Structure formats: structure tokens, C-alpha cells
């Protein structure tokens, strides 16, 4: 839900509500899963014999009205509880840290023109340099992505607060802060990066291993950063928004490495097949 809200509002603010934005986001997510699966299978850590997977499918039938309404109520009530607790509290935190800060050595509430002196600006400004190669290295976009770790819906709420949601011009302000390329780069990063804390907790329960949970989260963030870098550097180079620079070379290297991993034979799988054949021959003797 959170990713869908982020995609929808990005499409409305930056791309004029273009339907291709949400459609492309869906295919980007699917492509990331497929490409990651192929690439990881060709590494020593994840190499192995294909394991059979059997899943019994239920008997399909037309849903009853009662089941549909019950499912709608459960999902709707779950989101209402989430919006009234986690999202509300985090939005209050974002608002407070946005409109309070130190000016001339005095901690006080800030005017709109003084937001760059806020607590949140100090936090975002300290790490926004990390995202400059992605095209959206402003402290506003940085803190929006960070609050998305609490709940992806927070990205929309944070952008609304930081870009003047109170005066009804939030879409115009966001459109001025992001170009088409930087906006799409921002969307791709938040689409593919680490999920919210609740989903991270679910990953931890399923894996039952803190180390592998950290590896999974780190891998998602790495994929998101690389994909966003490629979108901005290559897309910006094509449109003339970005000049050729060191990060363009990095983006090209990422593309070349990805293609290489996709077409490279799986040497680890071949080694496993040889070992299996040797065992079979030994057993037959």
C-alpha cells in the first residue's frame, strides 16, 4: 500500500498523472526479482542443486459477498490502525522536527523561510551527500526516504509537510523540486530499497537469523541504489540533464556487470552436477 501511494503521488506531482509510471514500477519490481534470482544463483554462496517445490493449489471458486466484505473490512481496519498509530506519530515527529530548530542560538518554532535551520534539515543535510549521485541529494528527499523505513506511506506525508502541504500547492512545489529523471530515480530507489520496519520484522521471523536478515536488507538497499544510479546517470545523459562524469562510468559498469552475470554459465551448478555423477558411478560399482 505504501509503495502504491508513493508511486501514485509521484505520478501525479511530477509526471502529470501518467499511467505508465505505475505500470513501469510494477515491471521494474518484477525484473529486479528475476534478475536477482538469476545472478545470485550463479554465486558460490547461493549455488546448489535445484530443490523441488510442490504447492497444493486450492479449488478456485467465485468469492461470496460475505467473504469479500470481511476481507475488505480486515484490510481496511488494519490500515486505519496503522494510519492512526505509526503513521500519525511519525508524521507528528516529522512536523515537529521540521518547524523547530535553533536560530541565532535560540531553540524556537520556525517560520516557513527558516525551515533550512530545522532539526530535520540538520539530520538530512548530514547524509544527503550519499544520494547526490542519484539526482535527489536534497535534505527533504533524503529524510522522506528515511521516514519510509517506518512505513512507506510516510514518504508521501513527509513530502507533503516539507513541500507546503498546508497551502494546497504541494504538487507544484514537488514538481519544481524534481525533474522527470530525478523524480523517477527517487521512485525507483524507494520502490526497491528496504521495506518498512514491520516487513523487516517479518523477514527476521521467517529467516530466524539476524545475520541473513541484515544481508537481505543490505542487498535490497544496494540493488535500489544501483538501479536508481543507472536511471539518473544514463537517463540524464540521454536527456542532457547530466554531463559525463565518474558516476556515469559507474552506472555503465553496473549495466555491464549485470549483463555478464546473466549470460555467464553457472560454473557452480556444473561442479555440483559432476559431483553427483561421480557419486552415482561410485554407488553403481
Segments predicted by a language model, with ranges:
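Long hydrophobic segments that form regular secondary structure
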Residues: 45-46, 60-108, 128
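Short, small-residue-biased leader/transition segments that mark boundaries at the very start
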Residues: 1-7
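Juxtamembrane inter-helical linkers in multi-pass membrane proteins
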Residues: 46-71, 116-120, 163-167, 276-281
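Alpha-helical transmembrane segments
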Residues: 21-36, 248-254
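Alpha-helical transmembrane segments of multipass membrane proteins
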Residues: 28-37, 90, 94, 98, ...
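Extended, low-charge hydrophobic alpha-helical regions
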Residues: 92-222
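Membrane-interface capping segments at transmembrane-helix boundaries
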Residues: 42-43, 260-276
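Interfacial loop-to-helix junctions that mark the boundaries of transmembrane helices
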Residues: 15-25, 109-116, 172-179, 238-248
Amino acid at each position: 500500500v505504501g509503495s502504491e501511494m508513493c508511486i501514485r503521488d509521484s505520478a501525479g506531482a511530477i509526471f502529470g498523472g501518467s499511467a505508465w509510471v505505475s505500470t513501469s514500477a510494477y515491471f521494474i519490481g518484477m525484473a529486479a526479482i528475476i534478475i536477482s534470482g538469476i545472478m545470485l544463483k550463479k554465486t558460490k554462496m547461493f549455488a546448489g542443486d535445484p530443490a523441488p517445490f510442490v504447492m497444493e493449489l486450492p479449488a478456485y471458486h467465485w468469492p461470496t459477498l460475505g467473504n469479500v466484505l470481511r476481507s475488505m473490512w480486515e484490510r481496511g481496519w488494519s490500515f486505519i490502525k496503522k494510519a492512526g498509530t505509526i503513521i500519525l506519530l511519525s508524521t507528528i515527529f516529522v512536523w515537529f522536527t521540521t518547524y523547530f530548530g535553533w536560530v541565532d542560538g535560540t531553540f524556537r518554532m520556525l517560520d516557513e523561510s527558516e525551515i533550512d535551520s530545522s532539526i530535520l534539515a540538520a539530520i538530512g543535510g548530514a547524509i544527503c551527500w550519499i544520494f547526490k549521485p542519484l539526482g535527489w541529494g536534497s535534505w527533504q528527499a533524503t529524510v522522506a526516504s528515511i521516514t519510509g523505513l517506518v512505513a512507506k506511506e510516510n514518504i508521501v506525508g513527509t513530502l507533503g509537510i516539507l513541500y507546503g502541504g498546508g497551502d494546497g500547492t504541494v504538487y507544484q512545489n514537488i514538481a519544481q523540486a524534481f525533474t522527470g529523471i530525478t523524480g523517477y530515480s527517487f521512485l525507483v530507489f524507494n520502490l526497491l530499497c528496504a521495506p518498512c520496519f514491520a516487513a523487516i520484522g517479518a523477514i527476521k521471523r521467517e529467516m530466524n537469523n539476524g545475520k541473513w536478515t541484515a544481508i537481505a536488507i543490505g542487498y535490497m538497499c544496494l540493488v535500489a541504489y544501483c538501479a536508481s544510479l543507472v536511471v539518473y546517470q544514463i537517463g540524464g545523459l540521454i536527456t542532457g540533464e547530466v554531463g559525463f562524469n565518474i558516476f556515469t562510468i559507474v552506472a555503465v559498469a553496473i549495466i555491464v556487470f549485470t549483463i555478464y552475470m546473466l549470460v555467464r554459465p553457472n560454473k557452480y551448478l556444473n561442479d555440483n552436477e559432476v559431483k553427483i555423477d561421480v557419486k552415482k558411478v561410485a554407488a553403481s560399482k
